[in-house]
Regions:
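Bacterial N-terminal signal peptides
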Residues: 9-18
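Bacterial N-terminal signal peptides that target proteins for export
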Residues: 1-9
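Extracytoplasmic metal-acquisition and chelation regions
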Residues: 17, 22-320
Length: 320
C-alpha cells in the first residue's frame, strides 16, 4: 500500500524543516540525541544495541506504537514533528514508507541521519511472489517484500548498520555499542541455530497460511515451502470459495497438522479452511509478524527475540 503525504501535511513538513534547520537537530531542551525507529523490531534492535547506559545521552522513540499495521499507517502531525526534529531515523523503506521519504526529502536539517534498511539489505531483498492458489495483487509491479525483520540473518545485517549510525552520532558510545552488538549477535545466532535444528528435525517442510503471508524471509532462510491465501502486503483479505477449497485440499493432500494465521484477533478464514478439511481437526496457529505491537505489549515485556522464540514453538507444531 502506497502512503503519501496529504498536501496539508506536505506543507507542514516544509515549515517544520525550516524551523528545525534553523536551530540544528541536536539542540533540544533535554540535551539528548533523538533517535526515531518506525516499527517495533527496528526499535527493539536499537534498544538492545544501546544497552542500559545510554539513557542520559539518547532518547529512543517508537513511531508506530498503537498496533497500527505498517501497510495501513497514516502519519500524523506529531509523527512529522518527531521525524523532522530527530538526529537519526531508522526505517524499513519500501512503498509503505514513501510518506517518510517524502518528509525526509523536504527536511532541511543537514545533520539528520536516515537509515533505510531495505537499502542496507539491497542484495538480500525478495519480491513478493504469487504462488499456486494465492490471489494476486492488483498492482502489476514486482514490489519488494517489506517484512525484512522476519529473518534473523537480516537482523544481524541491519543491527550492524544501526550500530554504525549510532556511533556516528555519539562517538563516545562506540566501544559500548560494539560490545552490545557482539552480545546481541550471539543471541540472534543462537535462536537461528534453534530454528535450523527444528526445521532439520521436522516431519515435513511445508506450511500453510489462511491469511496474508509476510514470512517469506523467514521460510527462505531455512528452505521451507508454503501455501497462502494472499501476498504479504495484500490489503484485501476476503477469500473466495476457490481459495478456501484449494487450501483445504492442500492440508488433506500434504497431511498438514495446522493452518496458520498472522496476528489476527478473529482468524475466521483459517477456521473456515480447517473446518473444510476431511478430518476437520487441523489446528489453527498464530505466527506473529510483529506488525501490530503496542506500547502495552512492550510494557509487558515484548521483545524481538522473545517473539521469534515464540514463533519457533509455533513452527515446530506446524512441522511435526
Amino acid at each position: 500500500m502506497k502512503v503519501r503525504l496529504s498536501p496539508l501535511l506536505f506543507c507542514l513538513v516544509l515549515l517544520l524543516g525550516l524551523v528545525s534547520g534553523c536551530g540544528g537537530a541536536a539542540v533540544r531542551e533535554d540535551g539528548k540525541i533523538s533517535v526515531v525507529a518506525t516499527v517495533f523490531p527496528l526499535w527493539d534492535w536499537t534498544r538492545e544495541l544501546l544497552g542500559g547506559g545510554a539513557e542520559d545521552k539518547l532518547s529512543l522513540t517508537l513511531l508506530l506504537d498503537n498496533g497500527t499495521d505498517l501497510h495501513s499507517y497514516q502519519p500524523t502531525v506529531d509523527d512529522l514533528v518527531k521525524i523532522t526534529s530527530a538526529d537519526l531515523v531508522i526505517y524499513v523503506g519500501g512503498e509503505s514508507d514513501r510518506w517518510l521519504e517524502e518528509a525526509l526529502a523536504e527536511n532541511v536539517n543537514p545533520d539528520l541521519i536516515a537509515v533505510n534498511l531495505m537499502d542496507v539489505l539491497s542484495d538480500r531483498l525478495k519480491t513478493e511472489e504469487i504462488i499456486e492458489g494465492m490471489r494476486g495483487r492488483e498492482e502489476e509491479d514486482d514490489a519488494y517484500d517489506e517484512h525484512i525483520w522476519l529473518s534473523l540473518k537480516n537482523a544481524e545485517v541491519c543491527c550492524a548498520a544501526i550500530t554504525d549510525a549510532l556511533a556516528r552520532l555519539s562517538p563516545a558510545l562506540s566501544e559500548a555499542l560494539a560490545e552490545n552488538r557482539t552480545a546481541y549477535f550471539a543471541r540472534l545466532e543462537a535462536v537461528d541455530s534453534l530454528y535450523r535444528k527444528a526445521v532439520d528435525g521436522g516431519a515435513r517442510n511445508t506450511i500453510l497460511f489462511a491469511d496474508r503471508f509476510p514470512f517469506r524471509y523467514l521460510l527462505d532462510d531455512y528452505g521451507l515451502s508454503y501455501y497462502a491465501a494472499f501476498a504479504g502486503c495484500e490489503a484485501e483479505t476476503g477469500a473466495s470459495f476457490e481459495t478456501v477449497a484449494f487450501l483445504a485440499e492442500k492440508i488433506d493432500e500434504l497431511d498438514l497438522p495446522a493452518v496458520l494465521t498472522t496476528d489476527s484477533p478473529v482468524p475466521r478464514l483459517a477456521e473456515t479452511v480447517a473446518a473444510n478439511t476431511r478430518s476437520s481437526d487441523a489446528a489453527v496457529l498464530v505466527l506473529d509478524s510483529m506488525q501490530s505491537v503496542t506500547r502495552a505489549d512492550i510494557e509487558g515485556g515484548a521483545s524481538y527475540l522473545g517473539m521469534m522464540e515464540s514463533n519457533l514453538e509455533v513452527l515446530k507444531e506446524a512441522l511435526r
